[in-house]
């Protein structure tokens, strides 16, 4: 009985590791065709196994997931800078603007230009209704980059129970691997914009910096946060104010954003007195 349970856990760990590999590979290569046989070869499974594993993990087909990721990445790019439809299409893996526009309309029901105008109007409405000040103070810094170990959460950003479970698992993993030190930094990677993506499909990586080599194991993966120039905003108080701050940044951003990963760093965190919490948001800039 114990052997059977151990085998089941081992198989589950292998599957979780493969899911991490696929999701990270897709995220880094949305500009490519992303053929099924290539992805299956990368994780050493058949195409049929790949589709089955990923449907179970994503609660949607792999084809639907990739198509959705391409379009949602395009929205991010459109918010970053103005570009031709031809350039935008190629950046998210479409051969021509016609195919891209058709896929975009299938997902959102309107054209890319109409959608981005509607999104901007919606964000401005959020900021006005919150009564938030338009002026934002940002420090400019050059970030050296970090090696991270992560655990992924699918679902509504900041939902108490899954986040608490994930962070506790991450802390235990760090301790088990003797990777928790006084220099460990705690990072949050939000891959999706809840103003664009359904809240239950948002991907969050709870991360910790590591100095030593960590082998990806089960649900724990590794990722590198790239070096570069960032505008850094500070939130004092509960993390529940993060989305309001992100909306304010989107509407009142005074820098030229570059393609890169925005991230959060949790400088101090207390559940019993959240007013003393300090969170920094790093926005990649040119």
Task: State the predicted function of each range.
Residues 28-32, 80:
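Short helix-capping/hinge SLiMs at alpha-helix to coil transitions
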